[in-house]
Amino acid sequence: LLDDGNLQFLVKETTAKTIVCEVVIGGPLKSRKGVSAPDAKLTLSAITDKDRDDIEFALSKNCDYIAMSFVRHADDIRELRWLMKHLGKDAAVIAKIEMREALENIEEIIEVCEGIMVARGDLGVETPAEEVPFHQKRIISLCNGAGKPVITATQMLESMTQNPRPTRAEASDVYNAIIDGTDAVMLSAESASGAYPVRAVEVMSNIAHIAEEHLQESSSDYAEPIAKDNDHSNPTQYISNAISKATFDISKVIQPKAIVTTTLSGYTTRHVAKERPRTPILCMTPNEITQRRMALVWGVIP
């Protein structure tokens, strides 16, 4: 399957360097499109030689996040961390969830990375398209509970690559992802190669503002995240969870203009944000890297 499943080939013959295929579903194939083999268990390294060059370049420019494609399990993230340590640099890791194997290991992946991207293009090829909404909601819920930022991406406003207005279904898609608790929504082809890149950003931003206003006006609290607050095996985490929950409860009573957090790594701020308070969270930190990374977290003004 190529280009998010738009083209379908049947492999007839392979050699060490070539693959001969029969075209089942044809169409135009642009450059740099992905290739998927659903249900295949890959034994290749998660990091290719080109990936290594790209990672080294990104780290040399002091990037804040590195998004890792085709993550299968937590060891893929650990391999990336080892490489960054070997290069003498560091960046936060966003794991792109786009393979069936990643869904099977999603909780351990969330535990070892700094954030998750629901990459629905390849995910909708690796799994039936009708299952993608379930996987998206589950991943968002798990990330909310763990206090890890989650990005919902791919084909959110796909029609705006050619049209100045989104479809009603696309507007609903963006809105519902935000209502479900995603920290960020992302454009791909709409802004990278589409005919209306600025307009697409404006539309997505407007939908986000409307969704957030409706959440603020709602008489009910945000959905309670699935958090492991009762885990006494990690005293530091348990105490942080308790303080964050207490902060949230107090904010509901006194309704302050803002919640101010002080943090070095961003840990405290993320744990307050995972409670989804209606009050803006001001993140105070002496660490410039933490300040930039916190821009991705829900409700936080770094």
Question: What is the role of each PLM region?
Answer:
Residues L1-P302:
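Non-catalytic helical/linker scaffolds that mediate oligomerization, partner binding
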